[in-house]
Swiss-Prot record:
Key words of the record: Disulfide bond, Knottin, Secreted, Signal, Toxin
Tissue expression remark: Expressed by the venom gland.
Subcellular location: Secreted
Organism in which the protein naturally occurs: Lycosa singoriensis
Family the entry assigns: Belongs to the neurotoxin 19 (CSTX) family. 04 (U1-Lctx) subfamily.
Propeptide stretch(es), residue numbers: 21-41
Cysteine-cysteine disulfides: 44-59, 51-68, 58-86, 70-84
Domain notes: The presence of a 'disulfide through disulfide knot' structurally defines this protein as a knottin.
GO MF annotation terms: toxin activity
Name the record gives this protein: U1-lycotoxin-Ls1a
InterPro entries: Spider_toxin_CSTX_knottin, Spider_toxin_CSTX_Knottin_CS
Amino acid sequence: MMKVLVVVALLVTLISYSSSEGIDDLEADELLSLMANEQTRKECIPKHHECTSNKHGCCRGNFFKYKCRCTTVVTQDGEQTERCFCGTPPHHKAAELVVGFGKKIFG
């Protein structure tokens, strides 16, 4: 009976030690993830700014992430170039309008 108690105590000690290391690793991973998100947030492209070179780098708006919208521009030389900017798509604008209107009505 004594051997069983010793083995159980040993197992409990090993499990608690390994879980505490796992929690420390998890906290370190979360910290790295938060730091990466903060770095991404600093590097995102604001609304109405050019996103031609980074079409997936637009920032988040109030409810949705801005989308990179592109247009073809013809220069005075007759060359066509693509210019892109971060903006809110029409269906997102409509959703934001409805939510804003709902907040005004219901509080």
